[in-house]
Amino acid sequence: MTISPPEQEASVKIVVDRDPVKTSFERWAKPGHFSRTLAKGPNTTTWIWNLHADAHDFDSHTNDLEDISRKVFSAHFGQLAVIFIWLSGMYFHGARFSNYEAWLSDPTHIKPSAQVVWPIVGQEILNGDVGGGFQGIQITSGFFQLWRASGITSELQLYSTAIGGLVMAGLMLFAGWFHYHKAAPKLEWFQNVESMLNHHLAGLLGLGSLSWAGHQIHVSLPINKLLDAGVDPKEIPLPHEFLVNRDLTAQLFPSFAKGLTPFFTLNWAEYSDFLTFKGGLNPVTGGLWLTDTAHHHLAIAVLFLVAGHMYRTNWGIGHSIKEILEAHKGPFTGAGHRGLYEILTTSWHAQLAINLALFGSLSIIVAHHMYAMPPYPYLATDYGTQLSIFTHHTWIGGFCIVGGAAHAAIFMVRDYDPTNNYNNLLDRVIRHRDAIISHLNWVCIFLGFHSFGLYIHNDTMSALGRPQDMFSDTAIQLQPVFAQWIQNTHYLAPNLTAPNALAPTSATWGGDVVAVGGKVAMMPISLGTADFLVHHIHAFTIHVTVLILLKGVLFARSSRLIPDKVNLGFRFPCDGPGRGGTCQVSAWDHVFLGLFWMYNSLSIAIFHFSWKMQSDVWGSVTAKGVSHITGGNFAQSSITINGWLRDFLWAQASQVIQSYGSALSAYGLMFLGAHFVWAFSLMFLFSGRGYWQELIESIVWAHNKLKVAPAIQPRALSIIQGRAVGVAHYLLGGIATTWAFFLARIIAVG
């Protein structure tokens, strides 16, 4: 940190342009108003595709970084408005169409439902009996558990929150309009990173966490303590009563009677009745102790509030990001981070690339924590919801990571300036890209042959009737000893590091089964040869995804094959006529291919999760012990390719295939429909543009003959457009197929 005399620093001011862009509905109503070419209207059918491709490509509308920044800023408010409207809809469904109050009174026997299908031509078959005399579609979003954790006890509260969501959405829409048309920030405001860090860290994350901690302490904890004790939700005081009447809370948490005295006398241990450090899960709800999570959010708030005061603005004290970056260089890294500050303050694509990669990775980490440390009451025993949120956060993470690579490549093509990046880290990575990519390629080949080879060996030995020669827990063992050591360490360590804690951080490390209502919430997850094998398939598929995406970024500007690639742009089909073998080489094509491998990687990850949990974790608990859904067949079945096909895909597809005539029949139809969407994608991916252009011209000839020729000339999709439509349907079809397969199965057996 440095302290500088104030006169050296340019003082930070909030500067805006008043009324920079007039609000014109006439202009907005004109399709393609953002582009001179598109505004002329369509000559061919390509126009509508270009309209969609370029509507949000602000770089193509203008070269003015200030205007681009304002458009991005304004679009963020639009995004927030959409999120608030969506949230409002979720809360409204909870208020209007759900059995939330019934579920709250008996969450172990009644299933969550927030959608009732109207009887038009027999669809009411979808309204299954979810218990408590309610017929509806069983939902797996986890909202009921979240509402219970936040202390919502009635449908009126859900209505109020839904209205609040709409009010917030309106505010966001207004803010998006206001900050583009009425008071638009100047470029220097967007580039003032220290203020931005201070405000986002202290305001958004610090005060945000503090507000949530406050809500948890004053509203959620007392209400949940009463709910856990079996008090009828209708008898529980309303949230504001806990706020205005301290005695009410003090009956549940005695330290409340002492007020703020322990805080100001530094006698903080007094508050340990509602800020706990228990570890493990609440045996009543199977969720984390809410007093632990309140403590966690309070601690996080303190950290972020401190972090939000670290950066130097008008007071001449604190860190400067530019100074930190430029001072940060090692003995072997040339100019180090010099030049990176300029990249990150002038290229939104560079910013977005880093944020997407980190946010995507975080989403996948969240997916793992949601089952290992289920944060909400009764979440862990709702297997459909557990499977859904794991799958959801995994897919979201994958798309974000691929998006990170996409925007890194766009940055390389559009925003990278070689003259400002001599011998810094980025330049050095680009200069030894051949070594990086060829080594990564070798790693992929090694992992691919060895991981797949282990399975092929097992399939062969199994077919030859030689189980003693297979890699398995009962023959040739390949135990994941490192993973087992980590598990054991995490199980034993709290004895030393947190001697007063009741349990380690997660029941997955070791210890006893946590059961709620006769179902397993969480228990130690034993790892063996089967996990070792599939883990290496994960390593293989992830490395291939990284290889494709990183190659796209590092070779976005040039390669030995096409030295002037940067002049061709981010997406192009081939390097012009007369240069065979230069197709599918653009940065865009690497993103396109990376998406398929992302899909491969994550399909295997969610399949692994689904089967492992059904086999080794989820199940019912009786006096005789735990009875798992698939009876622990993962260890012996998943060690062959045939086992995955027969005992996972085929065996567990029976529920979706036989769902007709039951409340799950929609999943059967979706399973078929999504397969169709997926197959439809192959039409775009396997055939070339010329095939379609030829067909179209024949069809146009027929129209001309009949004098019904269109005014807008029909044209085949461009090569890139065809691939984009193809990959979109491939992923949509694949994900929806998996969704139907998972949910029909887990709702039927879970």
Curated annotation (Swiss-Prot):
InterPro entries: PSI_PsaA, PSI_PsaA/B, PSI_PsaA/B_CS, PSI_PsaA/B_sf. The chain crosses the membrane at residues 72-95, 158-181, 197-221, 293-311, 348-371, 387-413, 435-457, 532-550, 590-611, 664-686, 724-744. It is found in: Plastid, Chloroplast thylakoid membrane. Chlorophyll a' binds at H675. Phylloquinone binds at W692. Its EC number is 1.97.1.12. Gene3D superfamilies: Photosystem I PsaA/PsaB (1.20.1130.10). Keywords: 4Fe-4S, Chlorophyll, Chloroplast, Chromophore, Electron transport, Iron, Iron-sulfur, Magnesium, Membrane, Metal-binding, Oxidoreductase, Photosynthesis, Photosystem I, Plastid, Thylakoid, Transmembrane, Transmembrane helix, Transport. The keyword NAD does not apply. It comes from the Eukaryota. It is an enzyme of class 1 (oxidoreductase). The PsaA/B heterodimer binds the P700 chlorophyll special pair and subsequent electron acceptors. PSI consists of a core antenna complex that captures photons, and an electron transfer chain that converts photonic excitation into a charge separation. The eukaryotic PSI reaction center is composed of at least 11 subunits. Belongs to the PsaA/PsaB family. HAMAP family: PSI_PsaA (MF_00458). This is Photosystem I P700 chlorophyll a apoprotein A1. It comes from Chlorokybus atmophyticus. The gene is psaA.
